[in-house]
Amino acid sequence: MARATSDAGPAAIRQRQAQRGLTRLMVRDMRSLRRIIIPSRLEATVPAWITAVRALVDQYGAGSSALSADYYEAERVAARVTGSFSVPLADSPPEEQVENGLRWATKDVWPRDPDDPATTEAQRQPMDVRLEQAEKKAEAVAQKLVVDQGRDTVTGAVQRDRQATAWARSAALGACSFCKLLATRGAVYKQDTADFQAHDGCHCGVVPVFKGQRFELSDHAREWERLYREFAAPHSGDQLRRFRLALAEHGHLPGL
């Protein structure tokens, strides 16, 4: 008889919590780097700050990969599959990707002509406000880059492991509508072309599924699936918006 596994199983929840704990430590360390940026010397200090943050992304990304490898190996043992398998750790993100993300996060700190119509409201704010907003954006960018390494470690292992059949998305109760929609698809991902779609600040996890296992959506994911099918699926081109509204109306978007 096939053994059941779920997006809300104890191991999947612990893995999400471990990754969140890791990124909290990274954010703490990032905030200590803010002093590197000197408003009167942006051209010299912003690049230095980017270099320092990039080192943190490498450091914590390696930790995310290691956590995910341990998680995958434990799930493989729990599934009682045969044969040995060594989990390959995902590579660090390219330097260009990290730098582009951090440059985007800090784009509003640079001086602008307040009378220029192209200057946005965010760019007209006092420097301390602009720096605070840049820091929040940068933290979300770095968080995704770090956790992506862990998620890529699991999806990469599933693609290479002959005993793995698929992977599923594990979304928290407080996840956004986009993540909840993808989580309702269950264990349908296996191919090399099936990338894990994530946004800045995304804390979703990956659940590997092995031979002899049967994946089951959690109760809350089944409810998300019902809401999508009933309120959004028939409306082509407007499905995500309608799904978001349905989640909010039924108490599944606590952030709204």
Describe each region flagged by the PLM.
Residues 1-53, 148-256:
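Activation/maturation switch segments at domain boundaries
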Residues 2-158:
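N-terminal alpha-helical interaction blocks
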